[in-house]
């Protein structure tokens, strides 16, 4: 085998730490903003004109999907893609630039939320969203070079899901900026949610789920051909969903039931990931990330609420409860679990010795149960508890889960470097026979 120059991509391993720290800090601020929006002063959203409510929902939604969750995913990408594709077409200054744009954009939006004034929020969020959009646009050329440098053998377990996530980044950035520049245009509001959350983030989430169970743990979920077909069908379902949303917005389709199309790609990735095989391994005692397993399990409930919301809930701000569940119950849990697993790989902790993140999983369970109750309450089927109290409990549960992640990351990543290695254990142990001439894969820890 041809030897790969160590200098070509060796330095990129372990480059995720700065972005993880940015995420850990800003998600605490986000939880405060979430409480301020939905629990402290619910009239700010519920009793506001539809357009103003849309702006507030868009602001609180931009923070995770382009801010602190995106920081974690970009950090994972900076660490893993050079290992997967044996190429690092970027330098350390880019990582610092991404971190600065990310935290700067989030701070501007959070300050706008805390002002409780729609004019201030709009102007500050436009500036913040521009910074957040710019960070992913900058990754476009790098993503293309990584895509062009790959070989057919690279990343076969994730394949198009990872490639598609990379190549979609500039599109996500452009749509984000346009959605805030044209924030009074309902078409771009719909475009933001359908493309970025329902499409892009669902794709990223499945890439991480597949990377964990099939690539990292070696559980056989699907072959390369099945992988390609699954991706093609997913893209088709997302496109159909986007078209139906726009036809409903234009009035060409008046039946709100078409909004249930959001559940189609969610159900698809749930069943195509073979939950029977996942749970067969879990019940057999095989270890995995409890957070990623929990996120995968919540896909089914999220899809069910999507159908329920389309049928029973009349609201003008989109599939609010479904997307809330998708962001926090599925996307955030998957990204948290992937982040923890990657960091523990860098600490060379054996899988059987890793701690379960039960506090986070339980808090997300409480939050998701609260969202489901609020959806059923809005649909007129459950009226047992005061919805404002339930909303407060859900936000507090999310705050505790975010705090748990923050405490873990600070204590483990900032103050404890005793067992940290630049090369994660997964890569130091894989393919030893085929890469013995490559200095990048040592046979001993560094």
What would you call each of these model-derived segments?
Residues 1-446:
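Hydrophobic alpha-helical transmembrane segments of multi-pass integral membrane proteins
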């Amino acid at each position: 085998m041809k030897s790969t120059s160590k200098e070509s991509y060796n330095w990129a391993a372990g480059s995720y730490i700065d972005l993880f720290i940015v995420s850990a800090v800003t998600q605490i601020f986000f939880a405060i903003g979430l409480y301020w929006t939905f629990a402290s002063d619910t009239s700010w959203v519920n009793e506001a004109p539809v357009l103003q409510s849309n702006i507030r929902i868009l602001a609180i939604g931009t923070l995770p999907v382009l801010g602190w969750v995106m920081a974690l995913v970009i950090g994972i990408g900076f660490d893993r893609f050079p290992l997967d594709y044996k190429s690092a077409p970027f330098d350390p200054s880019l990582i610092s630039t991404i971190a600065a744009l990310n935290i700067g954009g989030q701070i501007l939006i959070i300050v706008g939320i805390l002002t409780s004034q729609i004019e201030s929020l709009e102007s500050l969020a436009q500036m913040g969203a521009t910074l957040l959009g710019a960070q992913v646009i900058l990754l476009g050329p790098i993503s293309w070079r990584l895509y062009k440098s790959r070989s057919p053998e690279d990343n076969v377990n994730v394949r198009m899901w990872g490639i598609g996530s990379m190549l979609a980044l500039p599109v996500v950035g452009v749509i984000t900026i346009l959605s805030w520049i044209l924030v009074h245009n309902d078409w771009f509001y719909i475009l933001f949610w359908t493309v970025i959350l329902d499409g892009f983030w669902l794709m990223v989430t499945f890439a991480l789920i597949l990377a964990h169970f099939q690539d990292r743990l070696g559980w056989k979920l699907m072959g390369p051909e099945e992988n390609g077909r699954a991706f093609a069908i997913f893209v088709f379902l997302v496109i159909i969903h986007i078209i139906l949303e726009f036809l409903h917005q234009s009035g060409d389709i008046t039946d709100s039931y078409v909004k249930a199309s959001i559940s189609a790609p969610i159900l698809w990735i749930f069943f195509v990931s073979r939950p029977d095989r996942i749970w067969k391994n879990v019940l057999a005692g095989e270890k995995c990330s409890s957070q990623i397993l929990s996120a995968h399990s919540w896909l089914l409930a999220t899809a069910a609420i999507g159908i329920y919301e389309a049928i029973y809930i009349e609201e003008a701000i989109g599939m609010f409860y479904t997307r809330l569940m998708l962001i926090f119950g599925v996307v955030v849990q998957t990204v948290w679990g992937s982040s923890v697993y990657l960091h523990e790989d860098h600490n060379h902790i054996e899988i059987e010795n890793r701690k379960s993140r039960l506090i986070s999983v339980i808090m997300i369970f409480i939050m998701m149960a609260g969202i489901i109750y609020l959806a059923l309450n809005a649909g007129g089927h459950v009226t047992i508890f005061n919805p404002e109290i339930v909303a407060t409990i859900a936000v507090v549960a999310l705050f505790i889960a975010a705090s748990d992640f923050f405490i873990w990351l600070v204590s483990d990543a900032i103050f404890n470097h005793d067992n940290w290695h630049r090369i994660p254990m997964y890569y130091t142990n894989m393919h030893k026979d085929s890469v013995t001439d490559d200095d990048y894969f040592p046979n001993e820890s560094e």
